């Protein structure tokens, strides 16, 4: 039973002539991109891949080579044009339906891709024929998968390469082999079923429907071949017709077995008679096919007519006689005539598989990518892809900027709400009648600034700096005066023989600059004195501000007049105690809510930074190229952008959740604050606070005024110290330069005396004069 599969049809491969990619490809790259681009190794690897694909074995390795070359061609088609203005290369392929004709020659890359796909179909069909003839469960599975892929690729060829040249790429021929290979895949299922089940538990009804489906596919194949112009190879039509008849016969046979299991002898006998008639016709059709045909598995074809004959004479005829005998003696069922038999509904067990599933459905995509390998020319990005990527980058930038603006708006809103609620002021109010005196917030801020400055020490430092600088100037002037005196003495003793330049001329630039500094230092000292006098006016207030106990002492008298804290706890009404407790709970809740809102800020900032990095690193070049490959099913640019931008949704949703949470927390803070301000105890404390504020208003105003004056003084002192620092640095430079110049003049004087000693007899007198020089 399992060897009743019909002889399997397969395709011969298209032959090709040598096409060298190296020279035209190199020329194109040099012309467009210049000689600086080095892709020689990639071009050679691509050329070798074509040479390998031109002559592959009927093995899995051969399939991988063909698919790898096709994948690289697919990559190439999106990066470089071919033909006159592109890579000037032509391809020559044979036509398997017209082997004696000249090779078809074209420069189209689509023609090259179609021919490679055709050879992939032919290789899969030959592998399927070899597997199916082994008659094992695993071989039937492998054959079925090959045929599913072959039919799927044939469909792709027919739909994607409409105007491909050659009869073997004709639309009707491709439609024919699509149906033929898919029909043979159904036969593999029947072969698998016959091995997996015995006669007693085989699902004959299902087998009948699958066989009917195969017969229908073979019938469609016959119509497609007959529609070709010029006519297709008649042997193709004979084989498809014979296979159709055989599968119709087997469908009737399987349905008969199904009816026998249901004890419907009349129907079973009718189907058996129909099967015998159709299978006899199929046997004659197979006998009419020549054994020299090179597209059918020959061992199967030579044995198959005898196999059908044996099946008809033994299994089928024996079953028919047994059924007729049982019907005559037991069932007495009316035998249904052949024309009245119900038509068997076809059920296609296996669909065609697209090229994307050539290596399986689960991990097939990753496997296919490994087979193809990296794009050899991925460094060359098509201009259309570059333009689209640039537009997409603008869209991602818009997404980020929108979220950045919203984050800033939310932070501003939070700060505004905090300022309006002023939690610290609410806390001041609630503590306004406690024994522990509070210092107003404005005074606390002023106090912190003054403590960090320490005005008294800084003013003393001003005067010390001024005095020090004046001493440095006096020292420099003294050095100049000593040098002038020595020079004058030597001039008086030696007269014209003393050639050293005049000291007044030498010292003039130094004296001028030093006098200017003395003048400005005098003005600065006057300013320092004015600052000191001004600070003396506010010194007491500043010292008071810097000492919290002094402030408390000043405020104590006004507080005592409104203080009720002297009451015993037993004297406080229960209602007031409850209000006090509620007020404390509300304040604690406000602090907690404020803390929770503030924690949202760093979380938002971290999420925003992650969004920025994701936007900057996002690259959809590969997606754009893959989308271009889909052709009719390709998305337009806006749709693709919309789909790609969804990858940012998790981060954006996290930000939006933060916004919503902030709104809820701020609303809750507003509600709690409103309840707090309606609390009678809070209203009482607010009245106390206002009384304290009004009584201490003048005191606070004076202290704040003094703090502002002290702040202005601190700024003046800082500028003065900065000025003195600049003057000190300049005086250090003057002192260094002057020291070097004085040393040089003394050396010049020594040289002058040395020359005089060689021409004068009064050596002792000159030596005495030399000792006067303090070298």
UniProtKB/Swiss-Prot annotation:
InterPro entries: ALIX_V_dom, BRO1_dom, BRO1_sf. Residues 574-601 form a coiled coil. It is found in: Cytoplasm; Endosome. GO terms for biological process: protein transport to vacuole involved in ubiquitin-dependent protein catabolic process via the multivesicular body sorting pathway. One of its GO terms (cellular component) is endosome. Keywords: Coiled coil, Cytoplasm, Endosome, Protein transport, Transport. PANTHER family: PCD6 INTERACTING PROTEIN-RELATED, TYROSINE-PROTEIN PHOSPHATASE NON-RECEPTOR TYPE 23. Involved in concentration and sorting of cargo proteins of the multivesicular body (MVB) for incorporation into intralumenal vesicles. Belongs to the BRO1 family. This is Vacuolar protein-sorting protein bro1.
């Amino acid at each position: 039973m399992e060897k009743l599969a019909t002889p399997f049809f397969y395709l011969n491969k298209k032959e090709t002539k040598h096409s060298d990619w190296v020279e035209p490809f190199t020329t194109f790259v040099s012309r467009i991109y210049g000689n600086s681009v080095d892709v020689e190794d990639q071009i050679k690897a691509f050329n070798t891949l074509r040479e390998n694909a031109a002559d592959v074995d009927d093995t899995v390795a051969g399939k991988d080579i063909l698919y790898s070359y096709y994948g690289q061609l697919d990559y190439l088609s999106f990066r470089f044009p071919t033909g006159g203005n592109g890579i000037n290369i032509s391809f020559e392929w044979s036509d398997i339906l017209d082997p004696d004709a000249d090779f078809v020659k074209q420069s189209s890359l689509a023609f090259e891709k179609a021919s490679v796909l055709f050879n992939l179909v032919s290789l899969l069909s030959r592998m399927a024929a070899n597997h199916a003839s082994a008659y094992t469960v695993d071989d039937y599975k492998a054959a079925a998968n090959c045929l599913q892929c072959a039919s799927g690729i044939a469909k792709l060829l027919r739909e994607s390469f409409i105007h491909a040249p050659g009869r073997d790429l004709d639309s009707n021929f491709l439609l024919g082999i699509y149906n033929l290979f898919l029909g043979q895949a159904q036969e593999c299922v029947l072969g698998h079923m016959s091995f997996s089940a015995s006669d007693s538990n085989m699902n004959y009804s299902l087998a009948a429907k699958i066989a009917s489906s195969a017969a229908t596919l073979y019938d469609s194949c016959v119509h497609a071949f007959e529609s070709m112009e010029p006519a297709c190879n008649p042997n193709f039509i004979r084989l498809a017709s014979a296979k159709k008849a055989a599968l119709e016969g087997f469908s009737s046979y399987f349905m008969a077995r199904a009816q026998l299991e249901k004890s419907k002898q009349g129907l079973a006998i009718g189907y058996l008679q129909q099967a015998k008639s159709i299978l006899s016709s199929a046997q004659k059709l197979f006998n009419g096919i020549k054994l020299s045909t090179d597209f059918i598995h020959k061992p199967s074809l030579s044995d198959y007519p005898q196999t059908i004959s044996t099946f008809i004479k033994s299994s089928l005829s024996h079953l028919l006689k047994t059924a007729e005998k049982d019907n005559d003696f037991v069932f007495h069922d009316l035998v249904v005539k052949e024309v009245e038999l119900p038509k068997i509904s076809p059920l296609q067990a296996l669909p065609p598989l697209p090229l994307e599933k050539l290596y399986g459905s689960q991990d097939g995509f990753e496997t296919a990518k490994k087979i193809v390998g990296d794009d050899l020319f991925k460094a060359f990005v098509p201009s259309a892809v570059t333009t689209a990527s640039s537009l997409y980058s603008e869209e991602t930038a818009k997404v980020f900027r929108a979220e950045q603006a919203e984050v800033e708006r939310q932070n501003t809103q939070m700060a505004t709400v905090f300022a309006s609620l002023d939690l610290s002021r609410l806390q001041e109010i609630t503590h306004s009648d406690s024994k522990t005196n509070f210092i107003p917030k404005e005074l606390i801020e002023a106090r912190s600034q003054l403590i960090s400055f320490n005005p008294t020490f800084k003013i003393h430092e001003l005067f010390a700096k001024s005095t020090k600088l004046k001493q440095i100037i006096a020292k420099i002037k003294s050095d100049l005066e000593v040098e002038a005196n020595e020079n004058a003495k030597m001039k008086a003793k030696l007269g014209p023989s003393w050639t050293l330049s005049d000291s007044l001329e030498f010292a003039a630039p130094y004296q001028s600059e030093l006098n200017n500094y003395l003048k400005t230092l005098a003005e600065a000292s006057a300013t320092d004195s004015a600052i000191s006098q001004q600070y003396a006016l506010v010194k007491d207030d500043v010292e008071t501000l810097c000492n919290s106990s002094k402030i408390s002492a000043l405020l104590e008298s006004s507080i005592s007049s409104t203080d009720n804290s002297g009451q015993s706890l037993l004297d406080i009404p229960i209602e007031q105690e409850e209000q006090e407790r509620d007020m404390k709970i509300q304040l604690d809740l406000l602090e907690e809510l404020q803390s929770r809102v503030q924690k949202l800020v760093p979380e938002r900032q971290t999420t925003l930074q992650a969004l920025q990095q994701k936007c900057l690193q996002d690259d959809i070049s590969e997606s754009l190229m893959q989308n271009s490959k889909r052709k009719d099913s390709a998305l337009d640019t806006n749709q693709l952008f919309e789909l790609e931008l969804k990858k940012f949704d998790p981060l954006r949703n996290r930000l939006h959740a933060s916004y919503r949470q902030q709104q809820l927390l701020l609303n809750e803070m507003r509600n709690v604050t409103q309840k707090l301000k309606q609390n009678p105890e809070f209203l009482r404390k607010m009245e106390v606070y206002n009384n304290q504020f009004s009584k201490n208003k003048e005191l606070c105003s004076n202290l704040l005024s003094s703090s502002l004056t002290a702040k202005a003084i601190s700024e003046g002192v800082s500028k003065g110290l900065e000025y003195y620092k600049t003057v000190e640095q300049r005086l250090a430079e003057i002192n260094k330069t002057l020291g070097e110049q004085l040393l040089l003049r003394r050396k010049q004087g020594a040289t002058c005396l040395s020359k005089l000693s060689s021409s004068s007899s009064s050596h002792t007198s000159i030596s005495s004069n030399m000792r006067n020089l303090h070298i």
